[in-house]
């Protein structure tokens, strides 16, 4: 009797960048970057200011085009299959790009509706998120009436309201006080334990070490390290190099 063996298929990465290149005029923002993010991973994308972190995120989410290379989300090209890939991603940007003419509840409801969530479900999700982040009493205000920390929480709510498979966060705790920072950290860890893939940019080594399973370091548009958190923390020369990069960027 002939036995048939079932071939094992390799899991498709949640995010794959292949030789990504992005220029602004003569400035090389991203230089031939390749990386993979496994489904369910928590990646800390470290780098000093101006290293290329935000540009990488903008390329993944379709906010910026690029000159060469490719980006895939669960095996789908983000350019050719934009309408299929974009709903899979929740983006929490640095800037407060919120509509001042909507209440904060409606900001979330409209965001969910944009990604095809039925109105009744959108309202339920919006209210649940606002309650979790202690914003439910502010739901009828416009975002300009919120403090900086509240705006930061609202951006996270907006990124999550359509229940994406991937959560991309660009410096989500920038300007947050210690209490809010720890609240966000705990919530992100909970989401990751539930299976959500998280890609977080930061220039705080403490934040990356606390949250991440995988740490990648980018500098001057190139990946200079990619590996497990344990590998980075054991290699003191790598940690020292990152601190030097951060200090050099601050001194520029």
Task: Label the model's feature ranges.
Residues 142-149:
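Conserved ABC ATPase signature
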Residues 226-227:
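ABC ATPase "signature
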Residues 163:
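Conserved catalytic motifs of ABC-family nucleotide-binding domains
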Residues 167-170:
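Catalytic Walker B motif of ABC-type/P-loop ATPase nucleotide-binding domains
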Residues 181-194:
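Helical segment within the ABC ATPase nucleotide-binding domain
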Residues 109, 113, 120-138:
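Conserved ABC ATPase "signature" region
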């Amino acid at each position: 009797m002939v036995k048939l063996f079932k071939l094992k298929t390799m899991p498709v990465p949640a995010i794959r960048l292949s030789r990504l290149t992005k220029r602004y005029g003569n400035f090389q923002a991203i230089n031939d970057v390749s990386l993979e993010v496994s489904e369910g991973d928590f990646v800390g994308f470290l780098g000093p200011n101006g290293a290329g972190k935000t540009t990488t995120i903008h390329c993944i989410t379709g906010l910026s085009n690029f000159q060469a290379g490719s980006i895939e989300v669960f095996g789908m090209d983000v350019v050719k299959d934009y309408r299929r890939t974009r709903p899979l991603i929740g983006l929490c940007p640095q800037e407060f790009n919120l509509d001042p003419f909507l209440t904060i509840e409606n900001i979330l409801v409209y965001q969910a509706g944009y990604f095809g969530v039925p109105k009744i479900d959108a309202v339920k999700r919006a209210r649940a998120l606002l309650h979790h982040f202690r914003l439910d009493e502010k739901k009828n205000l416009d975002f300009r009436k919120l403090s900086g920390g509240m705006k930061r929480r609202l951006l996270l709510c907006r990124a999550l309201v359509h229940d994406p498979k991937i959560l991309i966060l660009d410096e989500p705790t920038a300007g947050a006080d210690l209490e809010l920072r720890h609240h966000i950290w705990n919530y992100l860890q909970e989401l990751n334990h539930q299976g959500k893939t998280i890609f977080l940019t930061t220039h705080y080594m403490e934040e990356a070490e606390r949250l991440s399973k995988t740490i990648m370091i980018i500098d001057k548009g190139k990946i200079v390290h990619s590996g497990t958190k344990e590998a980075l923390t054991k290699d003191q020369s790598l940690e020292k190099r990152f601190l030097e990069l951060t200090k050099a960027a601050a001194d520029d």
